[in-house]
Amino acid sequence: MMRFSTNTSQQREEIILVEAADPYDLNRFVQAQACDYARALDEVRKGKKQTHWMWYIFPQYDGLGITSESKTYAIKSVAEAKAYLSHPILGQRLIECCEAAVAVDGKSASEIFRFPDDVKLQSCATLFAVVSSAGSVFARLLAKYFDGMRDEKTVHLMAITAPTGDSNTVC
């Protein structure tokens, strides 16, 4: 049993995570965010990303990145994306960061995140828009910064790796 303390903008939480109940090793994100989450959220709110946290704050689908960080923090399936979004810490944080990005006025995604992180943002929003309901913050983020367009590489990778009968439509 592992114990992690987290600090959110609203309250201090203590969550006990049992490794056996974490088939996707989502704890890797919780651990990575332990020191950087508040800073990442602050940078997004200010409309200027300055430090390095993109991989574990806005994760992408597996197969998009080539660095060790992108591989470590890649989401490998639709089921893992759903588990991430349902996680009591990670889902809330992802939504909070996406809401913060949507709330930034007068800047493009490339002005806030710079290349290539603006592309990673579109990939992340695409991934989680697929596993969320219409009108989600992920769809709103895509609408605001990417003319509603999903990242084609993410859609393609999700389509070719999705098991037969998956309940989410990737297209």
Pin down the residues of each PLM region:
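Extreme N-terminal tail/first-helix region
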Residues: M2-C35, P163-D166
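N-terminal targeting/disorder module
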Residues: A20, C124, F128-A134, L142-K144
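Hydrophobic/aromatic-rich, well-ordered segments within soluble, folded domains that form packed cores
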Residues: E43-V78
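Short helix-capping/linker segments at secondary-structure and domain boundaries
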Residues: G63-E69, A129-A139
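Charged phosphate-binding loop/patch that engages nucleotide di/tri-phosphates or the phosphate backbone
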Residues: S133-C171
